[in-house]
Amino acid sequence: MEKYNNWKLKFYTIWAGQAVSLITSAILQMAIIFYLTEKTGSAMVLSMASLLGFLPYAVFGPAIGVLVDRHDRKKIMIGADLIIAAAGSVLTIVAFYMELPVWMVMIVLFIRSIGTAFHTPALNAVTPLLVPEEQLTKCAGYSQSLQSISYIVSPAVAALLYSVWELNAIIAIDVLGAVIASITVAIVRIPKLGDRVQSLDPNFIREMQEGMAVLRQNKGLFALLLVGTLYMFVYMPINALFPLISMDYFNGTPVHISITEISFASGMLIGGLLLGLFGNYQKRILLITASIFMMGISLTISGLLPQSGFFIFVVCCAIMGLSVPFYSGVQTALFQEKIKPEYLGRVFSLTGSIMSLAMPIGLILSALFADRIGVNHWFLLSGTLIICIAIVCPMINEIRKLDLK
């Protein structure tokens, strides 16, 4: 237990740096959307920007996981933050001399996404080296709260800053945030995994396969991953349809869209705080199942509402947000607890890659059918499918056994 001495100081030091970086990155992300919308007015350009945001994780995730497990995760986290900072610095310098070309913004978005693809699994793999097992779920809850704060703050702050500053000034703030995050990681002593690096298989492909093999050996986690992939496949396209249902079905305005987004993020914040405060609850599969069920019920009710039911829809959005930490946070803690630390980089990169690949497939299907059957009916159909997933999840014996020590 010696490695957990002063774990709170270590975790919250890193957490504070990540808080600054996450919020500044979210602000910049929104500002870039404003910039691309203003300069091009093209839905294709915005779709490309979104695609570049998750493409590296989806395509290169398994290979990145091998590198995270082979090398010092602390150095990887610092390096990823500095790469993000360097990419932003290039944009800042160029913007002083000329108007930023769209192609350059796209390249920087891609580079930032690569940095995130390294940073996220490294951070998830480092956490169980710092935090006692019984505290992992609570820490995941606090991390979810931080993410929701960035969702709430970033649109308003980005809109304010973009109205008074040039884009390069906002980029400079994000560069500073990345530097602060790298400094907080640098000053924390993170336990090492001994001679792990020297003992790794020199065959890169075989190491990637080991990530899947480790998952398949734990039948409960593998089954949970499959359930989660199906859940993301159904749920993620709904994220893109909130503006559509707010304006087209409920006859709202951009203000109504903002209200639904703030409601969702506020619910997510409350859910993360509740998970952080009461994260020692042992029946975690029950929490995951309840989370999925809450999402399904909220979507189903949203799809059944009349066009005058916007207020109830806002309440449903808050419940959806409330449910999110009890799925993603608890699932992350389960993986951190059940997988050996030397494999966590590969496992988290692999799971992130699978989830990322499920997103575009679901988006394509929703784009094909939502307009044909009506966006409200798509919410109803998605909610019904998610309720079915919630019913099936605890019926799988291997998943139920995950709560057993």
UniProtKB/Swiss-Prot annotation:
Q: Kindly list the GO molecular function terms attached to this UniProt entry.
A: transmembrane transporter activity
Q: How does the entry describe its membrane topology?
A: Multi-pass membrane protein
UniProt keywords (A-Z) are:
Antibiotic resistance, Cell membrane, Membrane, Transmembrane, Transmembrane helix, Transport
- Cellular localisation: Cell membrane
Reading the lineage from the top rank, the first entry is: Bacteria
Against InterPro entries, the record matches this protein to: Drug_antiport, MFS_dom, MFS_trans_sf, TM_effector
Any one Pfam family match given in the protein's UniProt record, by short name: MFS_3
PANTHER family, alphabetically? BACILYSIN EXPORTER BACE-RELATED, MACROLIDE-EFFLUX PROTEIN
Describe the task this protein carries out: Confers resistance to 14-membered macrolides including erythromycin and to 15-membered macrolides but not to 16-membered macrolides, lincosamides or analogs of streptogramin B. May function as an efflux pump to regulate intracellular macrolide levels.
Protein's name in the database = Macrolide efflux protein A
- What is the source species? Streptococcus pyogenes
Quote the gene name from the UniProt entry.
mefA
